[in-house]
């Protein structure tokens, strides 16, 4: 049987990377102009894949609007293939909802141009999450084409079935030699073309499961090769033993599907780095970018969209266009070169502007919600709406920032008086809040005493006692188990001779810790919260020496401030650490020696929980990159021996390390000065141009937030607390209160362990969309409860299109029975009346 050799013409377009956006955009305009010219005169130049992302169309047409019809014509013809993404994202550093919105937007734009390429194309993403098959199937994509994170060889073939934990499957096609395995085929004449095709095809045959070979004719920012059809015809006439032809990814996958029964099954994350680096240091490069991204995702997903739904159901217009504009700015920052922090300094400065735009739009939209609930009136009586973004009833802290704090008390929705604690410019209290709902509080002027008790060394509540040590670390006694965790929150600093892509220790790696510092401490105790304040300096080497093999002798003091907070009725210790970074070429982490011995860590992932073994990965000198013990996380990481456990939650700090002995390290900061370097200890080849990036040293003041959660049993006994820490109540300032607004309301309620990830208006109708997932391995039978009667409930896919004929007429009931299979992501479309 003949081999079919598919040559796929494409380009990989990094929107911004070693040059800023506008320069790469100028090149993009030239490239697409060239492409359209070739397609207009060369009928045999059949296909060109525009990198799986649609933002390039927007970028191009902003400069060349006159080319819109010609571009649309070539896309409709199937000669230019676009989508399914808006941008090619990093997967681990963005939320699951961000990935879904990315695909929704890519689908919308593609449909405007007449055609969507249904290929799960991720040519250069730095590893892949285990739930990607389920996400892709939610968009009717049954395949995945990728490069990094997998090593194809004689045993592990380049085509396989990739299965998510819920059972969703896609046909995965690995590109063993990259998305550039056949670039510049024609630039030196036919003889070189002939030699390259034969060499590359013969090499790939040893990895293939089917009789199909994929030659990717393109690379970063390359133009189409006009002579390609001519050379293909000459080659085919000369070598009839194989079939060489101009193809595309859709045609290639159609051929592979014919042999689907022969493909082996693989489950889990794709993070192998034997042949292709996954560049694991990107998890902590330019940490300020990660923190900004997380804040913007939380703003849109947890506050703006659900509160806009709430006001929409009360009669306000849903601001779809503005919400989508905010999402576009956010998604533009989630390219793998952007969110990873691996570009030149100019790029990341421009990213901060886009994050600012997201926050400006988000806060404006929340202000619009507040104005609507206030009836656009003001009065001396000040009302505050406090919203709970979690789908269960919480008891948690509420913070209200206010200028004038003299003689203030609160009245809750039932008329109960609350005397909050006052810390600096904040009112702080603890209260219960309804699921996906709110309470209205009223500010009242009343004489009150400001009582703030002090002692030197400890704070406690019903669950935990926290004692501060001389070095600023803490011991936590869990009153429920009687177990004490000692010396938690030790700072550990070491040299970093790497670059924006990889941590790499210098040959002589001086480690500095806070174990022996003498800290200044004091405590404050209120009715609802007690705090320990810690101050010390960390004496750190200024930078690496010129040989980059050791840290400098000269040292500078870097001030550290830590605030430990313990709230009444809440079994966790919230930590805010402020670090003034005055030095370069280093990595700063915090250590939590829990003493819990385990062979695995459980980690919050995308729409679920990832189980990772705690054993050193085996490797040898043939590996292109050394596997690192640092791994990605979303909201939390947990160690448990089955009887007790310790969870560490975080806000926008995606890198951790866990050991079998029970140590957890959380990376706070990684300071480097180069986009890429060669000859690293941890990576054999350079990952990009060797360019200095002084702003990646991250000098200045940094603020980190994380929470310590001792618990009984496994992660399921603590993850609600972690999510409450990350997704805290949102306070909206009202003037007067609109007459028909209830003072307390739960819009929807869904019992844990199910987790709601999205509450928004439908993309195509006036209905409401709610998305949730089952993070456990058991089937859950429960009910979704609604404050407003439901008329119809329909299960839809991630595109918000019906999965099957499953419309349920609710006859204005307020609850719907659900049976949710293990690890499933479920999206429901709800038809409901407006609130009168």
Predicted features and spans:
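N-terminal catalytic cores of secreted or lumenal carbohydrate-active enzymes
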Residues: 1-97, 101, 109-111, 138-141, ...
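Structural recognition of the beta-strand scaffold that forms the well-ordered cores
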Residues: 7, 47-50, 81-84, 118-121, ...
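Catalytic grooves of carbohydrate-active enzymes
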Residues: 8, 12-18, 23, 170-374, ...
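The substrate-binding groove and active-site-proximal loops of carbohydrate-active enzymes
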Residues: 11-28, 51-61, 84-100, 115-127, ...
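Alpha-helical scaffolding within the catalytic cores
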Residues: 33-34, 62-75, 101-102, 152-168, ...
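Surface-exposed loop and adjacent secondary-structure segments within mature catalytic domains
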Residues: 69-79, 129-184
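CE4/NodB-like, metal-dependent polysaccharide N-deacetylase domain
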Residues: 99-138, 196-214
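C-terminal (or distal) subdomains of carbohydrate-active enzymes
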Residues: 132-135, 156-158, 174, 186, ...
């Amino acid at each position: 049987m003949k081999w079919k050799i598919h040559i796929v013409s494409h380009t990989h377009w990094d929107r911004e990377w070693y040059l800023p956006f506008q320069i790469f955009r100028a090149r993009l305009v030239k490239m697409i102009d060239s492409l359209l010219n070739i397609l207009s005169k060369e009928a045999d130049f059949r296909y060109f894949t525009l990198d799986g992302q649609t933002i390039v169309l927007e970028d191009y047409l902003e400069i060349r609007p006159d080319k819109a019809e010609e571009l649309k014509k070539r896309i409709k013809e199937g000669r230019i293939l676009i989508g399914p993404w808006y941008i090619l994202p990093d997967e681990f550093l963005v939320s699951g909802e961000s990935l879904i919105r990315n695909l929704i937007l890519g689908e919308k734009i593609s449909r405007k141009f007449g055609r969507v390429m249904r290929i799960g194309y991720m040519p250069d993403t730095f590893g892949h999450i285990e739930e990607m098959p389920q996400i892709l199937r939610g968009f009717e994509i049954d395949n995945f084409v990728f490069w990094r994170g997998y090593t194809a060889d004689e045993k592990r073939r380049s085509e396989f079935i990739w299965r998510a934990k819920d059972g969703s499957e896609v046909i995965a096609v690995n590109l063993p030699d990259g998305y550039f395995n056949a670039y510049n085929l024609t630039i030196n004449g036919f003889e070189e073309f002939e030699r390259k095709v034969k060499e590359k095809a013969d090499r790939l045959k040893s990895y293939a499961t089917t009789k199909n070979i994929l030659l990717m004719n393109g690379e970063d920012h390359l133009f189409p090769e006009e002579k390609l059809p001519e050379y293909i015809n000459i080659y085919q006439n000369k070598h009839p033993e194989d079939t060489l032809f101009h193809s595309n990814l859709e045609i290639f996958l159609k051929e592979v599907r014919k042999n689907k029964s022969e493909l082996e099954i693989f489950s889990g994350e794709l993070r192998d780095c034997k042949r292709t680096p996954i560049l694991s240091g990107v998890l902590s490069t330019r940490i300020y970018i990660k923190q900004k991204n997380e804040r913007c995702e939380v703003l849109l997903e947890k506050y703006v969209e659900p509160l806009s739904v709430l006001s929409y159901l009360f009669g306000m217009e849903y601001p779809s266009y503005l919400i989508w504009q905010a999402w576009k700015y956010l998604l533009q920052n989630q390219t793998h070169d952007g969110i990873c922090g691996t570009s030149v300094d100019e790029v990341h400065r421009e990213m901060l502007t886009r994050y600012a735009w997201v926050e400006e739009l988000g806060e404006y939209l929340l202000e619009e919600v507040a104005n609507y609930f206030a009836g656009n009136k003001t009065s001396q009586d000040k009302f505050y709406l406090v919203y709970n973004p979690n789908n269960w009833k919480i008891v948690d802290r509420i913070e209200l920032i206010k200028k004038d704090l003299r003689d203030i008390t609160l009245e809750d929705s039932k008329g109960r008086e609350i005397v909050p604690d006052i810390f600096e410019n904040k009112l702080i209290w603890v209260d219960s809040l309804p699921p996906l709902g709110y309470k209205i509080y009223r500010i009242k002027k009343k004489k009150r005493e400001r009582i703030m008790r002090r002692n030197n060394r400890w704070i406690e509540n019903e669950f935990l006692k926290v004692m501060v040590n001389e070095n600023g670390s803490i011991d936590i006694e869990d009153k429920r188990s009687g177990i004490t965790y000692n010396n938690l929150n030790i700072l550990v600093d070491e040299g970093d001779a790497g670059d924006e892509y990889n941590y790499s220790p210098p040959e002589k790696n001086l480690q500095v810790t806070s174990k022996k510092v003498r800290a200044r401490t004091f405590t404050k105790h209120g009715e609802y919260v007690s705090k320990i304040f810690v101050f010390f300096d960390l004496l750190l080497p200024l930078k690496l020496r010129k040989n980059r093999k050791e840290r400098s002798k000269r040292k500078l003091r870097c001030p550290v401030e830590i605030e430990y907070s313990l709230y009444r009725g809440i079994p966790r210790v919230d930590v805010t650490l402020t670090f003034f970074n005055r030095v370069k070429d280093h990595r700063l982490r915090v250590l939590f020696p829990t003493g819990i011995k385990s062979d695995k860590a459980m980690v919050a992932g995308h729409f679920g929980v990832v189980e990772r073994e705690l054993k050193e990965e085996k490797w040898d000198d043939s590996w292109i990159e050394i596997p690192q013990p640092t791994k990605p996380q979303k909201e939390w990481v947990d160690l448990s021996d089955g009887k007790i456990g310790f969870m560490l939650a975080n806000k926008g700090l995606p890198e951790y390390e866990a050991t079998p002995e029970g140590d957890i390290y959380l990376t706070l900061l990684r300071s480097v000065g180069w986009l890429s370097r060669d000859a690293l200890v941890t990576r054999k080849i350079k990952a990009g141009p060797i360019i200095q990036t002084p702003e990646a040293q991250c000098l200045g003041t940094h603020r980190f937030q994380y929470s310590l959660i001792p618990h009984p049993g496994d992660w399921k006994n603590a993850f609600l607390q972690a999510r409450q820490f990350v997704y805290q109540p949102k306070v909206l300032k009202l003037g007067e209160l609109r007459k028909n607004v209830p003072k307390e309301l739960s819009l929807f309620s869904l019992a844990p362990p199910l987790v709601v990830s999205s509450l928004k208006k439908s993309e195509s109708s006036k209905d409401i969309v709610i998305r949730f997932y089952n993070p456990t391995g058991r089937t859950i039978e429960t009910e979704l409860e609604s404050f407003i009667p439901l008329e119809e409930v329909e299960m839809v896919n991630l595109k918000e299109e019906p999965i099957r004929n499953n419309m349920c007429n609710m006859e204005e009931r307020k609850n719907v029975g659900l049976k949710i299979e293990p690890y499933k992501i479920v999206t429901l479309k709800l038809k409901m009346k407006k609130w009168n």
